[in-house]
């Protein structure tokens, strides 16, 4: 089959949507399908990557300040002005994708399958716009893949007028792929019949783990994104500053939190930034246990739980306000009986995930 995939980010970019795009594209190509992947390439040389994977890499070519796979991003005075005043109102600069999809569909007529991957959701709405304009050349089956909801996202409130764009792509696509059963709640009920649960997929063979050895000092690790007041470890970290026993708490993220935690803990709290997913999982597998700051929303499940499952170390759930240290103290002493069980890890194998997409065609 000829498969067209459109996503903001892919290899070598880091992040859940980049991983989703990369793993899915590579697996579909391994299965013998012709895969054309449009993403924001930047200046990265994909010649060797195309040769190794068989994927045809194409550039979305946005004109404005959307970040590229290689981490580059135009951000001049005009971009700063537009982002400051119009990011919330227009979803600037990602709104540009809405108008680029026409060209991509015209460049790739009569494909068997189209998979559009959000964030941003303007990729979906742009594809809907292209389907209206060019129905005769539009791909036979269209799957909208959504890691997070849009209009009903509890973490981000979009302008009400954008509901018309969500209605447009939800009504025109064939399927909406979401990562968990709970994700249904992030979409308007009239579209639930289109929703298919397809979890995040990973090639486990590319993710080595260490042979665990108990650390001299109890060592626990957190990885992932932080949303102040929502998915927020500050209360837990404040507790650690007063904890009078030796420990090592490693936080792996894109950007560090306040340096005061490092200083006031005498280095017992440590930040590690800029590591790729493979390195992060390796570090997780060496920790005594892992910290999961619980997500108060049931419509979003942190993809880091999959990485935690691959790492194979016990997982401690921590509330935002950290009201009771009892569970932490048990983990500290090596009692992991209350761990967060990550079951059915095989469901996340990319071979199974890619087949679930193909089963929709």
Predicted regions: what is each one?
Residues 1-61, 109, 175, 240-244:
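N-terminal subdomain of nucleotide-sugar transferases
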Residues 23-24, 122-125, 132-133, 144, ...:
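Membrane-proximal helix-turn-helix segments that form the acceptor-binding/catalytic region
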Residues 138-143, 150-168, 204, 230:
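Nucleotide-sugar donor phosphate/pyrophosphate-binding loop at the beta->alpha transition
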Residues 169-195:
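A short, active-site helix/loop in glycosyltransferases that binds the activated sugar's phosphate group
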Residues 182, 200-201:
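Carbohydrate-associated surface elements
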Residues 213-230, 237, 353:
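Conserved donor-binding/catalytic core segment of Leloir-type glycosyltransferases
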Residues 253, 258-281:
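Nucleotide-activated donor-binding/catalytic signature segment of Leloir-type glycosyltransferases, i.e.
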Residues 330-361:
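A charged, aromatic-enriched C-terminal amphipathic alpha-helix characteristic of glycosyltransferases
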């Amino acid at each position: 089959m000829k498969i067209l995939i459109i996503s903001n980010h892919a290899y070598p970019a880091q992040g859940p949507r980049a991983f989703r795009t990369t793993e899915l594209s590579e697996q579909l190509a391994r299965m013998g399908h012709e895969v054309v992947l449009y993403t924001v390439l930047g200046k990265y040389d994909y010649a060797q990557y195309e040769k190794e994977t068989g994927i045809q890499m194409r550039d979305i070519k946005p004109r404005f300040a959307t970040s590229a796979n290689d981490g580059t991003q135009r951000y001049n005075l005009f971009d700063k002005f537009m982002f400051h005043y119009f990011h919330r109102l227009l979803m600037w600069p990602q709104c540009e994708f809405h108008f680029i999809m026409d060209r991509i569909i015209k460049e790739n007529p009569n494909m068997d399958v189209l998979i559009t991957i959000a964030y941003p959701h303007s990729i979906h709405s742009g594809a809907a716009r292209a389907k209206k304009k060019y129905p005769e050349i539009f791909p036979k089956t269209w799957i909208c893949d959504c890691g997070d909801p849009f209009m009903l996202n509890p973490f981000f409130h979009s302008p009400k007028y954008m509901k018309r764009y969500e209605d447009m792509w939800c009504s025109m696509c064939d399927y909406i792929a979401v990562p968990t059963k709970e994700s249904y709640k992030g979409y308007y009920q009239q579209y639930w019949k289109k929703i298919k649960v397809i979890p995040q997929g990973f090639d486990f063979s590319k993710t080595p783990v260490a042979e665990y050895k108990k650390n001299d000092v109890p060592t626990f690790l957190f990885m992932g994104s932080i949303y102040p007041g929502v998915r927020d470890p500050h209360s837990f970290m404040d507790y650690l500053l007063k904890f009078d026993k030796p420990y090592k708490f490693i936080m792996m993220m894109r950007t560090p939190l306040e340096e005061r935690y490092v200083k006031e803990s005498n280095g017992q709290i440590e930040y590690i930034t800029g590591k790729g997913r493979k390195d992060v999982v390796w570090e997780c597998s060496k920790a005594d246990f892992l910290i999961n700051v619980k997500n108060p929303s049931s419509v979003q499940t942190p993809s880091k739980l999959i990485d935690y499952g691959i790492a194979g170390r016990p997982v401690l759930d921590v509330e935002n306000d950290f009201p009771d240290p009892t569970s932490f103290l048990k983990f500290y002493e090596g009692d992991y009986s209350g761990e967060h069980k990550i079951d059915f890890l095989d469901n996340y194998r990319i071979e199974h995930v890619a087949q679930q997409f193909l089963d929709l065609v």
